[in-house]
């Protein structure tokens, strides 16, 4: 515990120091735990307990003057406190051997070194942002969630991809991505970068959206070089929104796809928006052919204000959907049904002058057909 004064990594003789704390670290109001601003060293701090900062915690005081922090141990722990400076160079979460142990951020402030390609590394356990902060995890680098890891937003905003992002700045999903509330952004809205969620052919890739917002500037898809890979997708809560912008997309994969043995598509609430289309019947924008599915609510929306004029979406679903809506904001859109007949458990809503084309496939609607387009019916 630092009650007053300064506890400092000195960088003496440019030599790194490694400290392991098996209990908690507490920094009181007015106290400081930092790295010296002279000398250069990549120090290390391993914490098995909680980090409570009510003063100043600064592990990145300049180029080469850093302390990288590892949170370890199999128990749930927190980063909390009211200090205005809780500054990390990098954080590694290595808690236990599964995703069960949680490192939860509840502090008033927290920042990472945004000049690095990737500043948060998940090895084992869950990293959860509960504080209403904006946290940038990567700049140019991709971010990997391993099989035994979970990235979770519970009130804060997590960004993957910064000013130096490229098409390769993706979220590589082997484990779990979870949004309870708050936001997770993969890529920056408005950029023409294919920043994807790429789920692997191994591991147990899973997306859970129980509130808040998930934005993906590219696609949610398999690896482009092999056909294996199965995703478990669960969306609930009417306030939740998933937006797939589909920018600069790879046409060897759909904008949003769930298929193969072990895959799941479960939806009981919220909105799933596909903004962009390949606009080509040879390429499918929505491809749902999961191994299992439970659908009791939610709305799949084709198009948004970002969709170019005259676009046609191509949709495939072997499982029932609850609500389907075709957007007409700014301009009209067209949706073409492909391969399978479709069951819509509740409503099909066609806004403005948009068009839904069944292309000879049967459609069963359990609720209402709301067609605002009086000039076209196909």
Q: What spans do the regions from the language model cover?
A:
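Extracellular beta-sheet-rich ligand-binding/adhesion modules
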Residues: 1-378
């Amino acid at each position: 515990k630092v009650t007053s004064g300064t506890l400092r990594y000195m960088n003496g003789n440019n030599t790194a120091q490694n400290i392991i704390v098996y209990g908690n670290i507490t920094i009181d109001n007015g106290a400081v735990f930092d790295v010296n601003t002279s000398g250069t060293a990549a120090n290390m701090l391993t914490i098995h307990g909680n980090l409570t900062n009510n003063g100043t915690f600064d592990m990145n005081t300049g180029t080469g003057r850093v302390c990288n922090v590892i949170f370890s141990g199999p128990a749930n722990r927190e980063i909390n406190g009211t200090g205005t400076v809780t500054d990390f160079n990098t954080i590694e979460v290595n808690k236990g051997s599964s995703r069960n142990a949680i490192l939860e951020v509840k502090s008033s402030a927290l920042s990472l070194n945004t000049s690095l390609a990737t500043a948060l590394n998940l090895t084992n356990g869950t990293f959860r942002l509960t504080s209403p902060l904006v946290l940038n995890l990567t700049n140019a680098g991709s971010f990997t969630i391993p099989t035994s890891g979970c990235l979770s937003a519970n009130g804060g905003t997590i960004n993957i991809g910064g000013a130096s992002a490229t098409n390769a700045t993706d979220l590589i999903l082997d484990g779990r991505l979870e949004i309870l509330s708050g936001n997770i952004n993969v890529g920056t809205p408005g950029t023409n970068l294919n920043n994807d969620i790429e789920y692997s052919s191994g591991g147990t890739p899973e997306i859970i959206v129980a509130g808040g917002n998930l934005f993906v500037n590219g696609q949610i898809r398999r690896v482009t070089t092999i056909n294996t890979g199965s995703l478990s997708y669960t969306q609930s809560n009417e306030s939740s929104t998933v937006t797939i912008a589909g920018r600069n997309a790879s046409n060897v994969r759909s904008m949003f796809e769930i298929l193969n043995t072990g895959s799941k598509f479960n939806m009981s609430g919220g909105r799933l928006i596909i903004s962009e289309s390949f606009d080509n019947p040879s390429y499918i924008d929505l491809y749902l052919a999961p191994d299992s599915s439970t659908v009791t609510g939610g709305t799949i929306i084709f198009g948004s204000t970002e969709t170019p004029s005259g676009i046609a979406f191509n949709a495939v679903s072997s499982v029932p959907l609850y609500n389907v809506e075709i957007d007409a904001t700014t301009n009209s859109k067209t949706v073409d049904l492909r391969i399978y007949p479709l069951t819509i458990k509740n409503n099909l809503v066609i806004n403005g002058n948009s068009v839904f084309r069944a292309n000879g496939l049967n459609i069963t609607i359990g609720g209402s057909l709301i067609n605002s387009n009086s000039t076209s019916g196909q």
